[in-house]
A protein has these predicted regions:
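Structural signature of FAD isoalloxazine-binding scaffolds in flavoprotein oxidoreductases
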Residues: 98
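Catalytic core of pol beta-like nucleotidyltransferases
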Residues: 1-93, 102-200
Length: 200
């Protein structure tokens, strides 16, 4: 993982900036590597967003239970935008879009991991929708153990899809989370505290 940075504020259009305008060719650009706790604190601003974050943490727990504990996740979609006040939408987000880049556990193959947790690797649109409805995560898993050519192709695809809004074509940023489970329990505690109005 690259060094962690602070989550940049939404711009006037309610999207994350894709680059640091003051240093446009610096490494401080999307996908911004951020801590899971910062992610939870920043986006747990409504009951619906808390539900989605809970689903994301549950999805990560399922990945960890399947042995996928090394890698990173790209998070994007309407969840990363201030859609509640956007004139074109003015609604809460429905889910969070997540691409998970993962290392297979030692001695495991893609086939054995998928056989042990088939719901995490949907092969049909219906299975994908079932996963999304369960976790409120539009999930796309990608193994880091495949060919270099495929990894570059998939990374370029998702950066191209997520680097712009689909309806306005405006350039936007997104975030990167470490897949390791070390921060999940603290992040869940923060989310619970936010949900109950307590102090973590």
């Amino acid at each position: 993982m690259p060094p962690l940075v602070a989550i940049p504020p939404w711009n006037a259009e309610g999207i994350l900036p894709p680059i640091d305008a003051a240093a446009p060719i610096s490494a401080n650009r999307a996908p911004y590597a951020v801590s899971l706790s910062d992610f939870v604190l920043r986006f747990s601003t409504s009951q619906k967003r808390i539900e989605i974050l809970t689903g994301l943490l549950n999805y990560r727990a399922a990945l960890h239970a399947a042995g996928l504990t090394s890698g990173f996740q790209w998070a994007n979609g309407s969840f990363m935008e201030h859609v509640e006040i956007c004139p074109r939408r003015q609604r809460p987000p429905n889910d969070v879009d997540v691409v998970t880049f993962y290392h297979l556990p030692a001695g495991a193959t893609q086939a054995t991991v998928a056989a042990g947790a088939p719901e995490l690797f949907p092969s049909t649109p219906a299975e994908h929708d079932t996963l999304k409805n369960k976790y409120l995560v539009d999930a796309f898993p990608i193994s880091l153990g495949g060919s270099s050519e495929r990894l570059v192709d998939r990374s370029a695809y998702w950066y191209g899809v997520w680097g712009h809004q689909r309806d306005t074509f405006k350039w936007k940023g997104f975030l990167q989370l470490d897949l390791a489970p070390a921060e999940d329990a603290p992040a869940r505690a923060l989310l619970t505290a936010n949900n109950t109005g307590g102090t973590p």
